[in-house]
Amino acid sequence: MEEEMQPAEEGPSVPKIYKQRSPYSVLKTFPSKRPALAKRYERPTLVELPHVRAPPPPPPPFAPHAAVSISSSEPPPQQFQAQSSYPPGPGRAAAAASSSSPSCTPATSQGHLRTPAQPPPASPAASSSSSFAAVVRYGPGAAAAAGTGGTGSDSASLELSAESRMILDAFAQQCSRVLSLLNCGGKLLDSNHSQSMISCVKQEGSSYNERQEHCHIGKGVHSQTSDNVDIEMQYMQRKQQTSAFLRVFTDSLQNYLLSGSFPTPNPSSASEYGHLADVDPLSTSPVHTLGGWTSPATSESHGHPSSSTLPEEEEEEDEEGYCPRCQELEQEVISLQQENEELRRKLESIPVPCQTVLDYLKMVLQHHNQLLIPQPADQPTEGSKQLLNNYPVYITSKQWDEAVNSSKKDGRRLLRYLIRFVFTTDELKYSCGLGKRKRSVQSGETGPERRPLDPVKVTCLREFIRMHCTSNPDWWMPSEEQINKVFSDAVGHARQGRAVGTFLHNGGSFYEGIDHQASQDEVFNKSSQDGSGD
């Protein structure tokens, strides 16, 4: 044991480290009883350490870190010497993975938060642990180099790497689907998710310091006690680290779903990730560095996601763009805002009139109101009925009952009664009917100028007759010419001194049927000669 500790303290020289590895390759403690335990808890130690570069860039608050696997046979302070002794690149990963002193894996350019650190056991499954570390960092070159560093063959390590990658992808997809169902669009997630991630990072940092102490303690225990105590210690550490790994993995998946959909790299393309160790860790965005288990792609684009992309492609398309109608409404809102600004500027530029101008306008309005003759408006009396909603024309319920009962379901008779109730005798007598014909100049008639009937009342009566006959199909609807004829007849009878509609009662056979066209024509001709015809 002293011979093994001496070259470890001298420095990370590759030949000595490789020679010291050989006794551990031969020693197989409990080969028949604990193979499943070794496979289950065979995990590399992944600790967040900054890049050792010349000159080293200052890391951000949640700085991208390099994943370094620590062995229990050497104290951690010499890890930096081991890492700095190799040039950056895939060669450094191959040289570091083939040693039993800290096997340093190069950091990815994204620097996402990795799994918690756990020291690999001194067991024959070193190839599986190093290949798993290469799988987690999505570095095919590192996976191959880690496979060559163990005692197993290259084919076995490659098969394990592919199997681990397949298991990771399947597990990530299933976790993302379950979390998306549980989240329900993020409603069930707590708002302090980022704080939980920060606290998780702090816990990882403290656990790393504890693991350094464990490494020092493990060194003494390994040299003084038996292998059983060492295995029990490692078993307890692996148990704690496995639970921490699952917790960080779940938080990382939640943060991945919250931060947006990013394409996961295709494991088959090795050329994309050959230069990951040389990329500046500061080139990543804070969203990605807080994402935990996310993709190494630094681009924010959503194009060409691989088969292991966590969200569905339909969700990406929905989040990508708006519908054309939304874009039109957006532009319309912008144009309206600009128009409002222009109108506001114009309103502010208009000068306010002085008090003299305001007093003058007020005096003009008062004088105009004094000259106006207030016209008596048709105020609705008690129990009155409005013919149409849009017209201020009213009749009493008694008048309406009389008109309906006496019309015998004839639209012309109903119109005659309504004219009698709406217009007064003077309005009909001193009017020129509907105003469609001019007075005859040859008649030489002198007298007051005659004006047409109130167009509002005339229009209201026309519309009401049409509506009433349409809603009651058993009523006979008059034509436009017949409606005009009824108005002209009412004006003519008012000029003759008879009440409008008295002829309907006194001369019972005067308007009883349609066969009396001769009498109607005589009345029309007489009214036309007087100049009051339609």
From Swiss-Prot:
Low complexity bias spans: 91-109
Coiled-coil region: 324-351
Top-level taxonomic group: Eukaryota
One Pfam family matching this protein: BEN
InterPro entries membership: BEN_domain, BEND4
Region annotation Disordered: where it falls in the sequence: 1-24, 48-128, 287-322
Bias (Polar residues): 69-83, 295-310
Residue spans of biased composition, Acidic residues class: 311-321
This protein's record includes keyword Coiled coil: yes
MF annotations from Gene Ontology: DNA binding
Residue ranges, compositional bias (Pro residues): 53-63
PROSITE patterns per record: BEN
Keywords assigned: Coiled coil
Domain BEN: 390-498
Transit peptide in keyword set: no
SMART domains: BEN
PANTHER family linked: BEN DOMAIN-CONTAINING PROTEIN 4
Name the record gives this protein: BEN domain-containing protein 4
